Each structure stands twice: as structure tokens, then as C-alpha cells.
């Protein structure tokens, strides 16, 4: 049976009934929903009109009429309804109309489904769904988006001022911008977001201008942090998620970047004041706010560095002033107080770096640079390297000024080693430390072997094995020396004929590890010569390949002084003992006679005689009785001497070792510079002057800050010794001579 042909007008009239019914439903009029039979009739009508033989295939006409149906509805109903409303009411109407429009598109595209499947697919035309959305875009959106944008921004600003707004409505309206873009974000970004960001900038620019005048730095930061939190909430509630970084950037720029220096430099509440008053919460907030801004932390780190430097400089100045106003004894106590205070300062600001500033490298660098400034200053002629070595000595020696528990000692040593990192003359510290370590070990002044080894381990980790190898050798030497002494005592036990009749303890040391000491060919008293010979005999039974050099200046003697009232045990140096023993054979000796008998230098003899005749314990009487020793003086044994103690120690005036240490270090530095230059040139063969100097500085600065002039001088010296030569063509180039 042949199907009856439907002409265009008749078919479209029927479709209009369905479209009208749909519009009535959308307008909320009392209209029953479509039943399946009505739906099928509408679908079939379209199907039939599209599958009739030409010229009755109305596919193209129906495709056009589909679009016209939307256009008619929008022009007659939707636009008039929207044009009469404003602000929030207009936004509500827009959302309602958009929701209805999507329903209309869904229903109509189902009625016209056959068009989508065949006609549109074959002709590559826009699909029905897209045509429906395009109608709304071209007729409604293009006319209204500017008003909509203004209404939305007005509501956002209301909310910023603390008013309650309908966030769900804003979300729904802003979703239209995204949906109209059909998968692209241009409409949202160009028609709404760019204006909203501009408004945000203006809004916060106004706020910042008044807050920066009225508020303290902490209050301003609190407000800023709150604003940023609120803006992020806005994104979560109604803006598109892609707006967050842009929005936050605008707020940060206006509140934190534009007024950064004014905020941080506020006189009574800015960054300096917060550091001065230990406002850790505010400083943490400052870090949180500024670390998200490109280079935002640099000024904060800079102020931090200046603040720490000023505090450190003040401590150094305080120690300097005290040292100037006081006697030497209390000055050295002040210097020790200084190191303790510097450690406390470091502890305090390290907590700031790790907690307030979240371990950020900029603040580690600022702290390091600040400490390097004041940790390399001298106090009353003492370098910081020496002060630090003395501080360690006070902790590690018996009866030192620092009375601490084992744990506290370990903790303090750890901190001292950290401070050493800031000191440029590490080699000078090493030399002072070695000198003091030698005294602790040789005169049995070290309080605890474990602590001695522990600090060496810490120093080794910090500065490398080369730094501590000699010191470790010294500690080991002493253990070996004790074993050696036990063997010597066993030897005497089995060779009674060899016993010198004097208790003798000898400490044998390895030359390379210990500081250099002057050794003199002093004419020893016969009692002592016997001791030396006996020990030599013992030592040769152990080894024939080692030479013993005696350092008498480090020895100690216990001698019995028989005075008129009572006998007193005198603890003296080997040299002092040698002087006193001369008086066993004669009561009176002139300076010249003593000098001839002992074969000492004038300088040493004056020190010895002064300690025995002019100081606290006058074992010898001097003629004339003056405070200084001269070459015309005569000395006699003071038999009337007495003291309430049965045993007394007669000290020698201390020799200022500082000059010698500095000289030794300077000498070592010359060798170190030579070695560095040769090492570099050996690997590079040819190198420019400037580059050689800078590589040299880089290699050496782990141990000391090499002086450029000294490097140049060493280069010249190496040229004269045929290690290097200047290039004939270019005197700024050096060649290595193998």
C-alpha cells in the first residue's frame, strides 16, 4: 500500500501543535505532559516528511524551520521577559530562560531526530543540539552578556563588603558563560573573567590604600590573609576553578606587592619590629603571604639578615667595650661570654629559619651571611678563631669555667662546630685548637677522653679528614705513651741496677702531629742526666731506628725544698728545677754564673729567675731587691721561705703564643697556596691570570680566605722556581712546566 504524501504546510501545522504544547509547558501553564503516542506521532511526521520522494523530501526546509521555531520563541517571549528585569531579578530570569531553553532543545531535537541521523550527517551541517544553543547565544547572550557581567560583579563586590548574596544563583549564571562556549573557555574569559579581574584589582587597590595608612603591619597581614581565603572560597562556590590562580594573583599584587616596602618597613610594626619583639606568629604569617609571590621573600630575608647582623655586631661591640675597660683576666671571661651569647643567638634564629620561615633556602643563606659578618671580627686583638678555640678549651679542660653535664658538653660542642662553619680562618682555629689540645693532653688537664674524640669526629664531618688528622694523631699518641710508660716501669723492675732513684715519667710523641716546640741543649743537673740516659737505654731495647729529641721546656719536676721552718714540696718546670738544683752546692750565684752553668738564652733565664725571685713565691732572694731581673743581679737560696701549704706549684709567666701561631699558620698558608696553584696548573696546563686566582680562592676558601696579593706573590715565586712560566705573547697567560 503506498504511503500518503504529506505536504510541507500540512505537516508543519501538525508540528506547530507539538511546539506550542511544549512552550505552554515551559511557561508553566496548565498543560499535560507529552504521552508516548503524541511523541511517536510527532517523530513519525518528521520521519515521513524526510523520506518522501523528491520533490516532497522536506529535510532542508524542516532543518530551517527547526531553527526558526527557537528564534520565534526567543523574540516573542524570552527577550521581552528579560528586557523588563534588572540586576538580580534579570539574573534569575536569565537562568530560568536558559534552563527552559535547554529543555526545549532536548525535546525538539528528539522530535527532529531523523534529521540529525541522516540529513545533517550527510551534509556536514551543525547538529540540532548546537543549532539550538547557537540561537540562544546569537539572540539572547550577545545582547545581554554585558549587563549580566555588571550585575554579577556588583553582587561579588557586595559580598566582599560583607553582605549575604545568593551564591547558587551566581554559580548558575556563570555556568551559562561556560556552556555557551560549547567546550571552549573564551566566552567566560573574555566576556566575564577579564572584567571581574579588573574590578578585583580596583577593589583591593582602594582597600590597600586605606589599610596601609590605618593599620599596623600584623593587622594588615591578617586582613590580607583573610581576603585571600575569602577569594578562594568564591572560586569554590561560584567562579570557574580556572579563575583561582588569576584571582589570587590580582589580590596578592594589590595587597602585598604594591605596598610591600611600605608594609615591611613600617616603623613600629614592620618586619624589623616583629623580629625585635619576637612576634613569631606574625613572622610566620609574613612568610606564608610572601612565599607564594615571585621574589616576594627577598626583602624579608634581607631585613632578617640586617637584623641578625646588628644583634651580632652589638654582642661583639659589648665584648670589645668590656675588654677595653677591664683587666686582662676579666676580659678573657667576657670573650667566653661572647661565644656563649653568639651560640644562643644562633639557636634562637635557627628556630626562626626552621619554623617561621619553613627552612627556606633564602633564610638559611641570610643567617649564614649575617653570622659570617660578625663571626669574623676581632675582639680586643683576639681573632674569632682563637676565641672559639679558647671556648672549646674551657669546656674540655679540668676545672674549666664551663661547668656542664656530659650531655650539655656534647650539645655545646656540636654548636661550636656549627659556628666554625662561619669563620673564614678555619686553619687558624685548627692551630690554636691544636696548641690548647697539646697542653690539655701533656699536662693531664683534659677532663674526658670521650669528649676529646667526639669533637674531633664533629670537626672531621664539618671540615674533612685533613683538618683533624694531626689532632687525632695527638690523642692516639697519648694512649700509646701511657702504654710505653708502663713498659718502662716493667723494664726498671727487671733491671734494678738501671733505676735512677727518681720517679720518672716520659711521654714519647710523634713529631709530625704536635705543634713545634723549641728544644735547647741545656746543661742538665747530673740527677736529670742519669734519668735521660736510663730512658734512652730502655728505648733502644725497643727500636734502633728512632731518634729521641727531648723537649725539656714541657717537663715538670717535683722537688723537695728543705727550709728552716719545714720542708715543702715544690712543683716546678724542668728549667726551674735546673736553676734551683744549682743551689745545692752553693748558697749564692750571680746571673752570669747561672747563665754559664745552664747554657740558656737570656730571654728564658730572665723568665725563670723572675718566677723564682720576684713573683708570689720567693724561693730565691735577689740583690738588688727590685721587681725586674738584670744581668748584674745576684741570687741566693731563701732558707727563711715558708708557706701554710705542704705542696706548692710555682707558675712560669705565660708566653704569648698568639704571634707564633699566626706566624706558623702564615707559613702553612704559603705552602697551601703553592700546592693549590701547582695542582690547578698541572691539570689545566695553560690558564689566564684571573682564572688561576679565582680557582685558587675557590679551592682554598674551605680553610681560609686567601689574600689575592699573597696568591700573586706565590705565583711569582713559582715562576722563579721553574714551576710556571708566563706566555711570551700574552703575559697574562701562565704555562705549567713539568
Curated annotation (Swiss-Prot):
Domain Cullin neddylation: 668-730
Parts of the chain that traverse the membrane: none
Pathway: Protein modification; protein ubiquitination
Source species, domain of life: Eukaryota
InterPro entries documented for this protein: Cullin (IPR045093), Cullin_CS (IPR016157), Cullin_homology (IPR016158), Cullin_homology_sf (IPR036317), Cullin_N (IPR001373), Cullin_neddylation_domain (IPR019559), Cullin_repeat-like_dom_sf (IPR016159), WH-like_DNA-bd_sf (IPR036388)
Phenotypic consequence of residue 712 to M: No change in neddylation
Gene Ontology biological-process annotations: auxin-activated signaling pathway; embryo development ending in seed dormancy; ethylene-activated signaling pathway; jasmonic acid mediated signaling pathway; leaf development; phloem or xylem histogenesis; protein ubiquitination; regulation of circadian rhythm
Entry comment describing in which tissues the protein is expressed: Expressed constitutively in roots, seedlings, stems, leaves and flowers.
Sorted UniProt keywords: Auxin signaling pathway, Cell cycle, Cytoplasm, Cytoskeleton, Developmental protein, Ethylene signaling pathway, Isopeptide bond, Nucleus, Ubl conjugation, Ubl conjugation pathway
Crosslink position(s): Glycyl lysine isopeptide (Lys-Gly) (interchain with G-Cter in NEDD8): 682
Main location group: nucleus
Pfam families: Cullin, Cullin_Nedd8
PROSITE patterns: CULLIN_1 (PS01256), CULLIN_2 (PS50069)
Post-translational modification: Neddylated (rubylated). Deneddylation occurs upon interaction with the COP9 signalosome (CSN) complex.
Gene Ontology terms, MF aspect: ubiquitin protein ligase binding
GO CC annotations on file: condensed nuclear chromosome; cytoplasm; nucleus; phragmoplast; SCF ubiquitin ligase complex; spindle
Subcellular location: Nucleus; Cytoplasm; Cytoplasm, Cytoskeleton, Spindle; Cytoplasm, Cytoskeleton, Phragmoplast
Subunit organization: Part of E3 ubiquitin ligase SCF complexes such as SCF(TIR1) and SCF(COI1). SCF(TIR1) is composed of CUL1, SKP1 (SKP1A or SKP1B), RBX1 (RBX1A or RBX1B) and TIR1, while SCF(COI1) is composed of CUL1, SKP1, RBX1 and COI1. A SNF1-related protein kinase (KIN10 and KIN11) can also be part of these SCF complexes. SCF(TIR1) is able to interact with the COP9 signalosome (CSN) complex. Interacts directly with some F-box proteins such as DOR, SKIP14, FBW2/SKIP18, SKIP19/FBL20 and SKIP28/MEE11. Interacts with CAND1.
Family: Belongs to the cullin family.
Function recorded in the entry: Involved in ubiquitination and subsequent proteasomal degradation of target proteins. Regulator of mitotic processes which plays a role during gametogenesis and embryogenesis. Together with SKP1, RBX1 and a F-box protein, it forms a SCF complex. The functional specificity of this complex depends of the type of F-box protein. SCF(UFO) is implicated in floral organ development. SCF(TIR1) is involved in auxin signaling pathway. SCF(COI1) regulates responses to jasmonates. SCF(EID1) and SCF(AFR) are implicated in phytochrome A light signaling.
Protein name (database record): Cullin-1
Native organism: Arabidopsis thaliana (Mouse-ear cress)
Amino acid at each position: 500500500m503506498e504511503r500518503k504524501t504529506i505536504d510541507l504546510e500540512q505537516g508543519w501545522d501538525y508540528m506547530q501543535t507539538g511546539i506550542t504544547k511544549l512552550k505552554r509547558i515551559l511557561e508553566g501553564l496548565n498543560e499535560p505532559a507529552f504521552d508516548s503516542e503524541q511523541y511517536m506521532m510527532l517523530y513519525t511526521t518528521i520521519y515521513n516528511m524526510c523520506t518522501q520522494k523528491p520533490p516532497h523530501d522536506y529535510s532542508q526546509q524542516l532543518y530551517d524551520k527547526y531553527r526558526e521555531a527557537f528564534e520565534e520563541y526567543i523574540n516573542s517571549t524570552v527577550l521581552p521577559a528579560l528586557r523588563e528585569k534588572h540586576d538580580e531579578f534579570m539574573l534569575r530570569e536569565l537562568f530560568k530562560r536558559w534552563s527552559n531553553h535547554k529543555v526545549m532543545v532536548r525535546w525538539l531535537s528528539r522530535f527532529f531526530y531523523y534529521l540529525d541521523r541522516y540529513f545533517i550527517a550527510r551534509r556536514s551541517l551543525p547538529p540540532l543540539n548546537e543549532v539550538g544553543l547557537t540561537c540562544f547565544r546569537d539572540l539572547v547572550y550577545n545582547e545581554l552578556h554585558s549587563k549580566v557581567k555588571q550585575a554579577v560583579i556588583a553582587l561579588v563586590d557586595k559580598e566582599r563588603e560583607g553582605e549575604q548574596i545568593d551564591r547558587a544563583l551566581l554559580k548558575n549564571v556563570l555556568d551559562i558563560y561556560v556552556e555557551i562556549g560549547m567546550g571552549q573557555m573564551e566566552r567566560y574569559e573574555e566576556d566575564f573573567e577579564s572584567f571581574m579581574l579588573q574590578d578585583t584589582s580596583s577593589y583591593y587597590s582602594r582597600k590597600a590604600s586605606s589599610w596601609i595608612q590605618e593599620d599596623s603591619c600584623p593587622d594588615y597581614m591578617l586582613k590580607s590573609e583573610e581576603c585571600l581565603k575569602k577569594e578562594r572560597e568564591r572560586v569554590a562556590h561560584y567562579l570557574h576553578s580556572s579563575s583561582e590562580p588569576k584571582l589570587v594573583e590580582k589580590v596578592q599584587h594589590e595587597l602585598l606587592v604594591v605596598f610591600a616596602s611600605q608594609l615591611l618597613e613600617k616603623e613600629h610594626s614592620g618586619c624589623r619590629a616583629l623580629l625585635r619583639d619576637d612576634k613569631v606568629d606574625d613572622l610566620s604569617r609574613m612568610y606564608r603571604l610572601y612565599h607564594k609571590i615571585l621574589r616576594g621573600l627577598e626583602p624579608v630575608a634581607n631585613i632578617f639578615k640586617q637584623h641578625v647582623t646588628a644583634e651580632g655586631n652589638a654582642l661583639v661591640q659589648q665584648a670589645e667595650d668590656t675588654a677595653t675597660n677591664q683587666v686582662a683576666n676579666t676580659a678573657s671571661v667576657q670573650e667566653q661570654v661572647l661565644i656563649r651569647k653568639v651560640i644562643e643567638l644562633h639557636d634562637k634564629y635557627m628556630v626562626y629559619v626552621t619554623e617561621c620561615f619553613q627552612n627556606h633556602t633564602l633564610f638559611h643563606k641570610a643567617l649564614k651571611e649575617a653570622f659570617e659578618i660578625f663571626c669574623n671580627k676581632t675582639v680586643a686583638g683576639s681573632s674569632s678563631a682563637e676565641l672559639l678555640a679558647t671556648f672549646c678549651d674551657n669546656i674540655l679542660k679540668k676545672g674549666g669555667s664551663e661547668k656542664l653535664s656530659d650531655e650539655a658538653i656534647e650539645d655545646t660542642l656540636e654548636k661550636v662546630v656549627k659556628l666554625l662553619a662561619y669563620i673564614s680562618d678555619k686553619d687558624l682555629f685548627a692551630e690554636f685548637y691544636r696548641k690548647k689540645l697539646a697542653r690539655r693532653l701533656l699536662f693531664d688537664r683534659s677532663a674526658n677522653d670521650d669528649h676529646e674524640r667526639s669533637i674531633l669526629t664533629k670537626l672531621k664531618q664539618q671540615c674533612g679528614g685533613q683538618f683533624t688528622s694531626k689532632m687525632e694523631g695527638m690523642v692516639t699518641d697519648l694512649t700509646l705513651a701511657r702504654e710505653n710508660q708502663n713498659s718502662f716501669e716493667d723494664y726498671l723492675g727487671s733491671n734494678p741496677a738501671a733505676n735512677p732513684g727518681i720517679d720518672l715519667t716520659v711521654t714519647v710523641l710523634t713529631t709530625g702531629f704536635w705543634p713545634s716546640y723549641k728544644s735547647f741543649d741545656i746543661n742538665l743537673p747530673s740527677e736529670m742526666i742519669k734519668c735521660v740516659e736510663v730512658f734512652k737505654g730502655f728505648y733502644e731495647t725497643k727500636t734502633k731506628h728512632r731518634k729521641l729529641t727531648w723537649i725539656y721546656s714541657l717537663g715538670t719536676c717535683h722537688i723537695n725544698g728543705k727550709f728552716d721552718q719545714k720542708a715543702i714540696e715544690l712543683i716546678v718546670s724542668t728549667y726551674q728545677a735546673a736553676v734551683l738544683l744549682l743551689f745545692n752546692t752553693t748558697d749564692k750565684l750571680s746571673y752570669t754564673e747561672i747563665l754559664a752553668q745552664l747554657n740558656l738564652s737570656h730571654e728564658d733565664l730572665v723568665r725563670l729567675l723572675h718566677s723564682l725571685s720576684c713573683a708570689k713565691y720567693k724561693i730565691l732572694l735577689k740583690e738588688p731587691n727590685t721587681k725586674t731581673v738584670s744581668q748584674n743581679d745576684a741570687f741566693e737560696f731563701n732558707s727563711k721561705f715558708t708557706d701554710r701549704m705542704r705542696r706548692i706549684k710555682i707558675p712560669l709567666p705565660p708566653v704569648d703564643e698568639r704571634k707564633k701561631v699566626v706566624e706558623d699558620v702564615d707559613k702553612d698558608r704559603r705552602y697551601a697556596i703553592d700546592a693549590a696553584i701547582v695542582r690547578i696548573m698541572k691539570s689545566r696546563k695553560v690558564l689566564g691570570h684571573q682564572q688561576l686566582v679565582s680557582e685558587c680562592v675557590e679551592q682554598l676558601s674551605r680553610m681560609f680566605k686567601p689574600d689575592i696579593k699573597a696568591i700573586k706573590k706565590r705565583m711569582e715565586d713559582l715562576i722563579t722556581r721553574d714551576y710556571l712560566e708566563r706566555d711570551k705573547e700574552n703575559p697574562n697567560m701562565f704555562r705549567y712546566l713539568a
